[in-house]
């Protein structure tokens, strides 16, 4: 089994529908969805505000490369064209972390540094728009940074207050449909 933590964001068109398309596309693999947050753009490019959320999914058939392929397919289906770095996005789907079940059934974080796949996401620990929704859906989450697992709550506390304040609750529940209850927390 592999579990994935996905960060989804959109600042063009029907932002909420774009986020919903990913949750719908995950189907029964979706096990948890954060509330939706509105966030100032990150990276210094002038543009509209983003809607962001974190989705957690499990699928025994997906290896990390397959999760990447699925994320890119969600983006293509939304009409995403890769252009300006950190520019406006119809839809952005980032793999933040992947976990595989060990022989003892514990979840083990996957690390990868290969063509177009870096896990965990190398900038996730610097992005309040990733950390805040992730904590909302999994308060005990950890992320490996510089080779050491760190509580996501600690990573968020280390960010500047202005970064944390740039992320505001937009909708308290993801409210996608009745198939995906928000309250179902991931198992660890």
From Swiss-Prot:
It comes from the Bacteria. Disulfide bonds: none annotated. Its EC number is 2.7.6.3. One of its GO terms (biological process) is tetrahydrofolate biosynthetic process. It is an enzyme of class 2 (transferase). Signal peptide: none annotated. Keywords: ATP-binding, Folate biosynthesis, Kinase, Nucleotide-binding, Transferase. GO terms for molecular function: 2-amino-4-hydroxy-6-hydroxymethyldihydropteridine diphosphokinase activity; ATP binding; kinase activity. It holds the Pfam family HPPK. The keyword 4Fe-4S does not apply. Gene3D superfamilies: 7,8-Dihydro-6-hydroxymethylpterin-pyrophosphokinase HPPK (3.30.70.560). InterPro entries: Hppk, Hppk_sf. It catalyses: 6-hydroxymethyl-7,8-dihydropterin + ATP = (7,8-dihydropterin-6-yl)methyl diphosphate + AMP + H(+). Pathway: Cofactor biosynthesis; tetrahydrofolate biosynthesis; 2-amino-4-hydroxy-6-hydroxymethyl-7,8-dihydropteridine diphosphate from 7,8-dihydroneopterin triphosphate: step 4/4. Catalyzes the transfer of pyrophosphate from adenosine triphosphate (ATP) to 6-hydroxymethyl-7,8-dihydropterin, an enzymatic step in folate biosynthesis pathway. Belongs to the HPPK family. This is 2-amino-4-hydroxy-6-hydroxymethyldihydropteridine pyrophosphokinase. It comes from Mycobacterium bovis (strain ATCC BAA-935 / AF2122/97). The gene is folK.
